[in-house]
């Protein structure tokens, strides 16, 4: 260990100034938090989303002194991944960071869970992430740098009732993260994942509003509270920044301790 190496480290290692990040589904929910986090760290943001932005995300991101652009698109549509990467490169010149955040979850009992439930979740949660990463890697390999962050889940570790496809896609996304890391690491591209726990978002409102189910969740979390979206923002900045250049193939769990109980 050299003194020069110790002195070289600074908070600039967490800066994303001049970088460009794609955040799928980045105009709502946890995706909006990821987009805001990277913008606050200095990155320009490109958001492909099925849902058109209502102006809220654009206003918040532009207040950070960076640029943002949107593309209304279904990420599973034929040719969509290629179009997304091409549009980002046309607007910002390159892709430095890809956050595969977009995902869906359908609930049904195992014997009622047919292909109509299964296929869309495989397409959105897994195949779209694979295709976008494939296209982004074509840009990142020649520039000898890049960050791919896959938004996994506690269900990358657990089973989970009523949603076999969700658990299957999140387990697969964790494996995909490690496989891509193994191949792309030689090009100075880091591929990691974030596994959020239970967060206070619109999607979990029904669970939080029911005293019984709300308490059941809290009883499983050592932190004794639901996660706030800001709890995830530091993790996103870390994995997108030079501070994590030697972190590769890792799933960063941000769950208040849920998995240990």
From Swiss-Prot:
InterPro entries: NAD(P)-bd_dom_sf, Sc_DH/Rdtase_CS, SDR_fam. GO terms for molecular function: oxidoreductase activity, acting on the CH-OH group of donors, NAD or NADP as acceptor. Substrate binds at residue 153. GO terms for biological process: DNA damage response. The keyword Chloroplast does not apply. Keywords: Oxidoreductase. The active site is at 166 (proton acceptor). Its EC number is 1.-.-.-. NADP(+) binds at residues 22-46. PANTHER family: 2-DEHYDRO-3-DEOXY-D-GLUCONATE 5-DEHYDROGENASE, SHORT-CHAIN DEHYDROGENASES/REDUCTASES FAMILY MEMBER. Belongs to the short-chain dehydrogenases/reductases (SDR) family. This is Uncharacterized oxidoreductase YgcW. It comes from Escherichia coli (strain K12). The lineage of its organism: Bacteria, Pseudomonadati, Pseudomonadota, Gammaproteobacteria, Enterobacterales.
């Amino acid at each position: 260990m050299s003194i020069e190496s110790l002195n070289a480290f600074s908070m600039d290692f967490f800066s994303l100034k001049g970088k460009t990040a794609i955040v799928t589904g980045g105009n709502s929910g946890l995706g909006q938090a990821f987009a805001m986090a990277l913008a606050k760290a200095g990155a320009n943001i490109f958001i492909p989303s099925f849902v058109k932005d209502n102006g809220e995300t654009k206003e918040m991101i532009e207040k950070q002194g960076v640029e943002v652009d949107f593309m209304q698109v279904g990420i599973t549509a034929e040719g969509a991944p290629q179009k997304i990467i091409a549009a980002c490169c046309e607007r910002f010149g390159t892709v430095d960071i890809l956050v595969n955040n977009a995902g869906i979850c359908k609930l049904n009992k195992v014997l009622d869970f047919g292909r109509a439930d299964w296929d869309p979740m495989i397409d959105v949660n897994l195949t779209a992430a694979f295709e976008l990463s494939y296209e982004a890697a074509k840009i990142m390999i020649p520039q000898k740098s890049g960050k791919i962050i896959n938004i996994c889940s506690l269900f990358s570790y657990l089973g989970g009732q009523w949603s076999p496809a969700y658990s299957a896609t999140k387990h697969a996304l964790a494996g995909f993260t490690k496989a891509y890391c193994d191949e792309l690491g030689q090009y100075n591209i880091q591929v990691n994942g974030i596994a959020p726990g239970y967060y206070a978002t619109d999607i979990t409102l029904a669970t939080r509003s029911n005293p019984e189910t709300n308490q059941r969740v809290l009883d499983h979390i050592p932190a004794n509270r639901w996660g706030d979206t800001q709890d995830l923002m530091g993790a996103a900045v870390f994995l997108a920044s030079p501070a994590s250049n030697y972190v590769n193939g890792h799933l960063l769990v941000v769950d208040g301790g849920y998995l240990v109980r």
